[in-house]
Amino acid sequence: LDVGSGGGLPGVVLAALEPGWSVTCVDSVGKKVAFIRQVAAELSLRNLAGEHARIEALQAPPFDLITSRAFASLADFVVPTRRLLAPTGVWAAMKGKSPELELAALPPGITVFHVEPLTVPGLQAERCLVWMREAAPPSPGLVHS
């Protein structure tokens, strides 16, 4: 699931590179979704779907991967998509420089397991990819103090 897909990044690219994946791009702007659907048709990407909806209203089965690029703060990204994440799924959010304040504002139960620095050719700006998942529940029988 690519949230706030806009022109289709990274959703269209993921669908093209991973034909075995089913990729859904969701955006609240109908023209952007129409563009993604046109790209899917022109490139014969049968594994790519565009959904015109606000993420809060999207009805869909759970996703193994939920992505965003320039959608919202990390908390505003994970909170409305949490119900759409598969039990073993992960979130991947592209951000500018390492978003320390956003990381600190994540809701309880969300674990950041990797922050990957990115280099974008032609850009001097810092970028990173933040990988998150639901924290593992405590094992039964363990005592926590």
Regions found by a protein language model. Name each.
Residues 1-6:
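Conserved class I S-adenosyl-L-methionine
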Residues 18-145:
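S-adenosylmethionine
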Residues 7-20:
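Conserved SAM-binding loop of SAM-dependent methyltransferases across substrates and taxa
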